[in-house]
Swiss-Prot record:
Basic and acidic residues bias (residue ranges): 84-107
Tissues where the protein occurs: Prismatic layer of shell (at protein level). Expressed primarily in the mantle with highest level in the mantle edge and lower level in the mantle pallium.
Signal peptide positions (record): 1-19
Protein name (Swiss-Prot/TrEMBL): Uncharacterized shell protein 1
Organism: Pinctada maxima
Superkingdom field: Eukaryota
GO cellular component: extracellular region
Region (Disordered): 82-158
Amino acid sequence: MQKLLLAVLFFSLLAIATARPKYHKQGRRKGDACRLHCLFDNIVCETPCRVLFRSRFSYHVCARDCRKDRVDCYIGCKNIDANPKAEAEPGSLDKEAGTKGEKEKNGKKEKKEKKEKGEYAIGNAESGTGSSGGSNKTHDDDDDDHDDVYENDDENEE
């Protein structure tokens, strides 16, 4: 029993000390960053179960809550993908920076500054050629929900 408590304490401290990766600052879309956060949280949650329980049944009982949390997290990420207009501009961190017109003006200014400094990530779908105005949409999306823009053919082949 003492070993179990020490192991739980150890993994709790490890989970607290482990910094969650900042996927949204790596140039990823909000939906993708959300799914990666769900995956990271699931791994941190299930690791003590894998280490502590040797039998398959005990492991599944331990990991059941982690899996429920992961499913709920993915459902929340689908809501983020369904409401792309609620997302902030790629350069701004706060969602309520002003009116839509102010955001567009600020986004274009920030984009020009970042382009001059070369701060865009390679392979970022939003970097494009600079003519997209900070959006990864290339055409009217009334007919489909696909917003992905691929910059090279290697990413299209899976």
